[in-house]
Swiss-Prot record:
GO terms for molecular function: RNA binding. This is Maturase K. Keywords: Chloroplast, mRNA processing, Plastid, RNA-binding, tRNA processing. It comes from Brasenia schreberi (Water shield). Its main location: plastid. One of its GO terms (biological process) is tRNA processing. The gene is matK. It comes from the Eukaryota. Usually encoded in the trnK tRNA gene intron. Probably assists in splicing its own and other chloroplast group II introns. It is found in: Plastid, Chloroplast. Belongs to the intron maturase 2 family. MatK subfamily. Pfam families: Intron_maturas2, MatK_N. InterPro entries: Domain_X, Maturase_MatK, Maturase_MatK_N. Disulfide bonds: none annotated. One of its GO terms (cellular component) is chloroplast.
């Protein structure tokens, strides 16, 4: 890995990142394909592990060498006409290997730039966690008025993705090879949608292309943020697939304007309390400004995307709501600002009296029905929420079946530890526990009662976590189900958590 990073530094010239010209020679390096196929790289901060994406675990070094030899023997640039002749009989393997190699090179180049920028932030490892955004929202949203729920539009043509990369990469052979691949495997006249465009074997490449597209769509927000403050936002230097995390900057200095800036709208520069977070294609923009000003932001973004990126975005994809009356769904949580009543006792010299007041409090709960819908899709229960057996796991050993169900249950509990109403998760645990018992009963052709009697406490212990035991010592039993806990080791959303 050190050898690869050393060579990449010579090719990419990180200090001149925007003028990358020498990516194509890396496609002739055998270890590039080995690293791209390696589980350690596939389970990086950008993507899910390979077992979740459905990648084949097989890797043939011999076929990779043949692929590199064919690349060397090409005396002319590959065109979309002879691309099918080039891949030859190993079409499936080459069609997966070439995009994996290209995506791996681009991932490493972006991640090297990411690490170099994040090293200037104290404790930047904590910012990698998805849960790190919720303490920020808890600190800021209680003082704001309106929130915009935004769905970032998809590009209507694959060439838009390539044009986005051309602004950062000037390596013509690499872009030409990528264009040939896209034209060969997809109909470029159809709109890009997650289900239609991203196949399992090429999901990694298209996720990278989509991430670069979203990053460019957010470029206008970078400009406006820098114009509103003298402080440089280091967080925007980071290229992350998850979220852009604002640091908690306490004092913002409004940028002074000279005579040449008088023609620019004032609200571009004099509203520092505009906060923006994103995960994948969904983003949240909150501010203390009026509803009219939020509507201006809405139509400005729609027109900007349509004119600059040729993205067809309808105003209905951006919902503006008042925080005190509406909740928004983000990262598997239903979040909002609630008025919590408080009774304060004031003691005077001789008299004491009670004061009834209400404070704004950021609240997060787990919507149970979307989560049950995910369990239905995964075939753990039916549409009514009744647990069913997982028939595809019936051939596994008893310990593997129990371990798989326990792992899912513990991960869901770990991810939703920030909910203020954890009692709703009891139903999810019940569904998974009974589904596990019915799967074992199906395997042994027995009944659920007999399985539970035979396994006893072993079946229950697998669904309990050490974290629950530790937390029970910290908080009282009455506060255990209402206390929100955010973990800083969650770097990707749980697969069963719906994100829309």
């Amino acid at each position: 890995m050190d050898k690869l990073q050393y060579e990449l530094q010579g090719y990419l010239q990180i200090d001149r990142y925007r003028k990358q010209r020498f990516l194509y020679p890396l496609l002739f390096r055998e270890y590039i394909y080995a690293l791209a196929h390696d589980h350690g790289l596939n389970s990086s901060i950008f993507y899910e592990p390979t077992e979740n994406l459905g990648y084949d675990n097989k890797f043939s070094s011999l076929i990779v060498k043949r692929l590199i030899t064919r690349l060397h023997q090409q005396n002319h640039l590959i065109t979309s006409v002879n691309y099918s002749r080039f891949v030859g009989p190993n079409r499936s393997f080459y069609s997966q290997t070439i995009p994996e190699g290209f995506a791996g090179i681009m991932e490493i180049s972006f991640s090297m730039r990411l690490v170099s920028s994040l090293e200037r932030i104290a404790k930047y490892q904590n910012l990698r966690s998805i849960h790190s955004i919720f303490p920020f929202l808890e600190d800021k949203l209680s003082h704001l008025s309106y929130v915009s729920d935004i769905l970032i539009p998809y590009p209507i043509h694959l060439e838009i993705l390539l044009q986005t990369l051309r602004t950062r990469i000037r390596d013509a052979p690499s872009l030409h090879l990528l264009r040939c691949f896209l034209h060969e495997h997809h109909n470029c006249n159809s709109p890009i949608t997650p289900k239609k465009c991203i196949s399992i074997e090429n999901q990694r490449l298209f996720l990278f292309l989509y991430n670069s597209h979203v990053y460019e769509c957010e470029s206008i927000l970078v400009f406006l943020r820098k114009q509103s403050s003298h402080l440089r936002s280091i967080s925007f230097l980071a290229f992350l697939e998850r979220t852009h995390f604002y640091g908690k900057i306490k004092h913002l200095v409004v940028a002074p304007r000279n005579d040449s800036q008088r023609t620019l709208p004032l609200w571009f520069f004099k509203e520092p309390l505009m906060h923006y977070v994103r995960y994948q294609g969904k983003s949240i923009m909150a501010s203390r400004c009026t509803n009219l000003l939020m509507x201006k932001w809405k139509y400005y973004l729609v027109n900007f995307w349509q004119c600059h990126f040729h993205l067809w975005s309808q105003p209905s994809r951006i919902h503006i709501n008042e925080l005190s009356n509406h909740s928004f769904y983000f990262l598997g949580y239903l979040s909002g600002v609630r008025l919590t009543p408080w009774v304060i006792r004031s003691q005077m010299v001789e008299n004491s009296f009670m004061i009834d007041t209400a404070i704004k409090r950021f609240d997060t709960i787990v919507p149970i029905f979307p989560l049950i819908g995910s369990l239905v899709k995964a075939k753990f229960c039916n549409v009514s929420g009744h647990p069913t057996s997982k028939s595809v796991w019936a051939d596994l050993s008893d310990s593997d079946i129990i371990a798989r169900f326990g792992w899912i249950c513990r991960n869901l509990s770990h991810y939703h530890s920030g909910s203020s109403k954890k009692h709703s998760l009891c139903r999810i645990k019940y569904i998974l526990r009974l589904s596990c018992a019915r799967t074992l009963a199906r395997k042994h052709k027995s009944t659920v009662r007999a399985i539970c009697k035979r396994l006893g406490s072993k079946l229950l212990e697998e669904f309990l976590t050490e974290e629950q035991e530790i937390v029970s010592f910290i908080f009282r039993r009455t506060r255990l189900h209402s206390e929100r806990i955010w973990y800083l080791d969650i770097i990707r959303i749980n697969g069963l958590v719906p994100n829309s």
